[in-house]
Swiss-Prot record:
Protein name listed in UniProt: Trigger factor
Species this chain originates from: Mycoplasma genitalium (strain ATCC 33530 / DSM 19775 / NCTC 10195 / G37)
GO BP annotation list: 'de novo' cotranslational protein folding; cell division; chaperone-mediated protein folding; protein transport; protein unfolding
Secretion signal span: none
UniProt cross-references to PROSITE patterns, sorted A to Z: FKBP_PPIASE (PS50059)
GO MF annotation terms: peptidyl-prolyl cis-trans isomerase activity; protein folding chaperone; ribosome binding
Alphabetical UniProt keywords: Cell cycle, Cell division, Chaperone, Cytoplasm, Isomerase, Rotamase
Presence of the UniProt keyword Cell cycle in the record: yes
Enzyme Commission (EC) number: 5.2.1.8
Pfam family, any one: Trigger_N
Places the protein is found: Cytoplasm
HAMAP family assigned to the protein according to its UniProt record, in alphabetical order: Trigger_factor_Tig (MF_00303)
Source organism phylogeny: Bacteria, Bacillati, Mycoplasmatota, Mycoplasmoidales, Mycoplasmoidaceae
Amino acid sequence: MKLYKVLNSKTTDKSLCLEVEIDPNYWQATQKKLVGEMAKSIKIKGFRPGKIPPNLASQSINKAELMQKSAQNVMNSIYESVQQEEIVASNDNVIDDYPTIDFKTITEQNCVLLFYFDLIPNFQLPDYKKIKDLTPLTKLTEAEFNNEIEKLAKTKSTMVDVSDKKLANGDIAIIDFTGIVDNKKLASASAQNYELTIGSNSFIKGFETGLIAMKVNQKKTLALTFPSDYHVKELQSKPVTFEVVLKAIKKLEFTPMDETNFKSFLPEQFQSFTSLKAFKSYFHKLMENKKQETILQENNQKIRQFLLTNTKLPFLPEALIKLEANRLLKLQQSQAEQYKIPFEKLLSASNITLTELQDRNIKEAKENVTFALVMKKIADIEKIKVDNNKIKAEIENVIAVEYPFASDEMKKQLFFNMEQQKEFVESIIINRLTTTKIVSYSTH
């Protein structure tokens, strides 16, 4: 027996409203059942608790409370079924999470509910094909991979003094330097006994290359310019003079990794590799994934900024904002649990109230929802779809990279667990493919 029927539906710019009538017999049976439950707590002189006649108990029960509890019961019973109604489930613009529920009629005889489902807004996309300064997606080069292997080898390195030589690329320069802007010493651009690896590009352009071939105790003045995107706004594009003294030159010496010693360089989680070849094969895949993920994240942030700045939505679905704000709060609470810190104590230490945090989360949720809606529309226009084969390949790749030594049985369990989050995995793949597509327009 169906517990309800849809009497009517109405669509506006922002919502789809379903008028739902609860089956009268079910509605009255729900009230009768609750009268019996509520009667157990009623006290009437001359009757033992729970032994009050139904007609007398019904007269003593708070009618408003009975209606409220009955309505909540039937809403819980029909909620998922209403979400699966054809008019809701078949419309991609309907957000079936968190509908607002109101009463049209509620009496002892019948109950009519109104389910308001938010709709995805209609909006104009900005020209996402012309976003500037995106980085092309490139494969891991042999030089990059060898550099990563060298970094591992350098964990067992020793520093030796080579102050009798001229400063070269790759050396560690021990320097005193003073930055001068507008004839004034700049404390934030000055230091003593600073260790600078030449070629690290950790200083502004021209600084490190300007020191090459210097000798110990030599002084040098560098006339440079802060970049236009320098992190200190007041210094962007400003001329700066650096007075530098080279105090010492050092170099890292290390033993190259080979088949006989490679395990001594590896972290504990990699100790099960039995050959350098097997480790390098895995490590190459790990570094390839890391490079691609880094480029994608950098591009994604630039794309996000462009889309948020240049997209105007007529409204944002409250259901999605609520869903995302709740997700952010749960994430913050789980992080506190991870560090075994009571959430209230973490809020106090951060000098923020729960209300202030929730307001901040709502602001972030609005940006996240806007970005997600715009990316979804781009994915639809570009006909980006993900089938089960792609989801399977993604899960298998994650397991291969994150759990290289898992047994076959454990891999099966991991696959099963991740497959239960199929929608989440699908959203990650679609976001990656959409980002990649936008980058392809920008870099060609």
